[in-house]
């Protein structure tokens, strides 16, 4: 039986994206997105909860994210969850779960500067949305 691994989030950029290139020359950009959830409790008191998601984009989408995304901007990200594992220099094992983006849409104005942008970009057909 085939599984499903799909994630869709709408939130605000926590920081400017960081781009690098793999030894084989593939662009990879990483950034974090904060989502917020509001609700009213049984006592009629308002509550707010935030979640922070690590996101990585590859290839052409990585370059587009680096060029157009900035801290404070609202963004839609679609992709899949991936957990990476590695061992540090002291032999300790570490894990990181992140969203591997295959689509990004800039939704509105930056909170830090009122400059509306409405851009949609997809990695489909790019062939560069996987790690080396």
Annotate each PLM feature.
Residues 14, 20, 58, 82, ...:
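Conserved positions in beta-strands of structured domains
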Residues 41-67:
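A beta-strand/beta-hairpin structural motif
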Residues 10, 14-16, 52-54, 58, ...:
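Conserved beta-strand residues within beta-sheet cores
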Residues 58-94:
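Beta-rich strand-turn-strand
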Residues 88-106:
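OB-fold/S1-family single-stranded nucleic acid-binding modules
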Residues 1-4, 20-24, 41-46, 91-92, ...:
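Acidic, gly/ser/pro-rich intrinsically disordered tails
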Residues 9-49, 85, 95:
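Core FKBP-type peptidyl-prolyl cis-trans isomerase
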Residues 8-13, 33, 71-82, 101-104:
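OB-fold and OB-like beta-barrel modules that bind single-stranded nucleic acids
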């Amino acid at each position: 039986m085939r599984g499903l691994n799909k994630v869709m989030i709408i939130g605000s950029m926590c920081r400017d994206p960081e781009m690098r290139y793999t030894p084989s020359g593939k662009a990879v950009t990483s950034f974090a997105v904060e989502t917020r959830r509001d609700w009213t409790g049984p006592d009629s008191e308002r509550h707010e909860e935030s979640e922070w998601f690590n996101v990585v984009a590859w290839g052409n989408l990585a370059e587009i994210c680096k060029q157009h995304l900035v801290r404070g901007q609202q963004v839609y990200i679609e992709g899949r969850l991936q957990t990476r594992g590695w061992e540090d220099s002291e032999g300790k094992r570490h894990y990181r779960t992140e969203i591997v983006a295959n689509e990004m849409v800039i939704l509105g104005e930056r909170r830090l500067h009122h400059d509306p942008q409405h851009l949609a970009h997809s990695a489909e057909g790019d062939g560069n949305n996987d790690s080396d």
